[in-house]
């Protein structure tokens, strides 16, 4: 992927940049692997806002991604690298030798015509999926399972990768992109390589309209609201928040307060907590 910077012809294009999409080989998605998905707009089943600043944006078809990679020992040819509007990584269309088609997250370096496979005896190559117990120390991996058979839940965003740092007993220790070090069962699977589209982090939207196009609404500061809308609101002019520390709209400590439940069972598997 490359980044194309706009010339400063207008205020909106002055700082804007876009992907050049040179790695994309197919423009329309595989119809059998897409589905309509109702846009929640940040609401739950009762219509109550549970995730603020969401709504609008362009309509999208959801691409059904194979995060489980449970088609064991059957080779698949990479037929295309595609754009997915639902995530910042690219996706790869696979044609299996038995005729089935599936989408997977495209690792960096995966190209059309290459062959990938999942299984315990899969070769050590980019795009192949193996149990963590079979992956050498120091290897870069992504799409990592937390529970065997549930499918990859960690390390799925553009450019992300984890590293295998140790193996002991029934657990494999991995270092996550957040610098957290945690143990995972050795039966859990992961895919070799790092996720594609690593330069996504360098894109600049340039104007608010592109953010709205992505389905993100304005993030309004609490200090400019009324006191009925936010604990930071009210006062004459630019008043201080009037509390010992910043809080959320519902009065909970914000901006740095630890929110993880101390009684979580998985805390025993975290060797080193993530850094800020």
Curated annotation (Swiss-Prot):
Quaternary organization: Part of the 50S ribosomal subunit. Forms a bridge to the 30S subunit in the 70S ribosome.
Example of a GO MF term: structural constituent of ribosome
Pfam families, A to Z: Ribosomal_L2, Ribosomal_L2_C
Role noted for this protein: One of the primary rRNA binding proteins. Required for association of the 30S and 50S subunits to form the 70S ribosome, for tRNA binding and peptide bond formation. It has been suggested to have peptidyltransferase activity; this is somewhat controversial. Makes several contacts with the 16S rRNA in the 70S ribosome.
Biased composition regions of type Basic residues, renumbered to the chain: 210-220, 259-276
Leader sequence residues: none
Protein name as annotated: Large ribosomal subunit protein uL2
GO BP: translation
Disulfide bond positions: none
Keywords recorded for this protein, A-Z: Ribonucleoprotein, Ribosomal protein, RNA-binding, rRNA-binding
Originating organism: Synechocystis sp. (strain ATCC 27184 / PCC 6803 / Kazusa)
Region (Disordered): 1-55, 210-276
SUPFAM superfamilies tied to this protein: Nucleic acid-binding proteins, Translation proteins SH3-like domain
Residue stretches of biased makeup (Polar residues): 12-22
Family, as annotated: Belongs to the universal ribosomal protein uL2 family.
CC terms in the record's Gene Ontology section: large ribosomal subunit
Record InterPro entries: NA-bd_OB-fold, Rib_uL2_dom2, Ribosomal_uL2, Ribosomal_uL2_bac/org-type, Ribosomal_uL2_C, Ribosomal_uL2_CS, Ribosomal_uL2_dom3, Ribosomal_uL2_RNA-bd_dom
Basic and acidic residues bias (residue ranges): 23-42
């Amino acid at each position: 992927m490359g980044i194309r910077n706009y010339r400063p012809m207008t205020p909106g294009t002055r700082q804007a940049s876009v992907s050049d999409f040179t790695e994309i080989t197919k423009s329309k998605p595989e119809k059998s692997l897409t589905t309509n998905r109702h846009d929640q707009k940040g609401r739950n089943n009762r219509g109550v806002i549970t995730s603020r600043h969401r709504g609008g944006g362009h309509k999208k078809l959801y691409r059904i991604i194979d995060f489980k990679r449970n088609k064991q020992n059957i080779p698949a040819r990479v037929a295309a690298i595609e754009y997915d509007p639902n995530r910042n990584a690219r996706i790869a269309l696979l044609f299996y030798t038995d005729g089935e088609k599936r989408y997977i997250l495209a690792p960096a370096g995966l190209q059309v015509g290459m062959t990938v496979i999942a299984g315990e005896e899969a070769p050590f190559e980019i795009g192949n999926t193996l149990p963590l117990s079979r992956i050498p120390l120091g290897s870069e991996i992504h799409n990592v399972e937390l529970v065997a058979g549930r499918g990859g839940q960690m390390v799925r965003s553009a450019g992300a990768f984890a590293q295998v740092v140790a193996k002991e007993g029934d657990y494999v220790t991995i270092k996550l992109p957040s610098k957290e070090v945690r143990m995972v069962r050795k039966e859990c699977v992961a895919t070799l390589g790092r996720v594609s589209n690593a330069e996504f982090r360098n894109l600049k939207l340039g104007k608010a309209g592109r953010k709205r196009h992505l389905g993100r609404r304005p993030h309004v500061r609490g200090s400019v609201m009324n006191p009925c809308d936010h604990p930071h609101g009210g006062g004459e002019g630019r008043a201080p928040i009037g509390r010992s520390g910043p809080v959320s709209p519902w009065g909970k400590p914000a901006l740095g307060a630890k929110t993880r439940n101390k009684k979580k069972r998985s805390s025993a598997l975290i060797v080193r907590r993530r850094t800020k």
